[in-house]
Regions:
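Beta-rich strand-turn-strand
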Residues: 101-106, 111-119
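Non-catalytic, conserved peripheral segments adjacent to functional cores
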Residues: 1-100, 118-163
Length: 163
């Protein structure tokens, strides 16, 4: 399948605002009154990615990710709409976010996603997904089935390629 460049239905791109004062800055990552209930986080984690390194591409069957890119580096985000019933099926979308463009990004199930640290220093990403990693008590998102993740990064012949 050949992907075409375009916006992807259901993906939320929300600029994050840093409020600066003499002490530093503060940024609200999410608020329940500004995020649809279907995307309300149930856990949160932070990851650090080395310069030039990518995470993904992968997708989820049931989980939506709510990523926050604030810096101190920049990331190129890659999205592919693999949902057959989606009005934007076959679309590919990219953008650079992070220190130069702080962004909250909600990615619904079935949208393949990856990000690559394109800056010169280590980059931090927050994720506040709407499902628990490995399910309740880490017993599997469907008991006995491990993690809700299809890892395309493990397939060298994957159609989801980063540039």
């Amino acid at each position: 399948m050949e992907f075409r460049t375009g916006d992807i239905d259901g993906v939320i791109w929300r600029p994050l605002k840093k409020y600066h004062d003499p002490r530093g800055w503060l940024c609200e990552l999410f608020r329940h009154d500004e995020l649809s209930a279907e995307f309300h986080p149930v856990m949160a984690y932070i990851s650090m990615t080395e310069p030039g390194v990518a995470r993904g591409p992968h997708e989820h069957i049931d989980q939506s990710d709510c990523f926050c890119f604030l810096g101190p580096s920049n990331f190129k985000v890659y999205l592919w709409d693999a949902r057959k019933a989606s009005p934007t099926h076959g679309a590919r979308q990219t953008d650079v976010v992070g220190i130069d463009k702080p962004m909250l990004l909600v990615i619904p199930p079935g949208v393949v996603h990856a990000y690559k640290n394109v800056g010169a220093e280590q980059g931090i990403v927050f994720n506040c997904p709407n499902r628990l990693y490995k399910g309740w008590n880490r017993k599997g998102w469907i008991p006995g089935q491990g993690v809700d993740e299809i890892r395309h990064e493990d397939d060298a012949a994957s159609r989801f390629q980063l540039d």
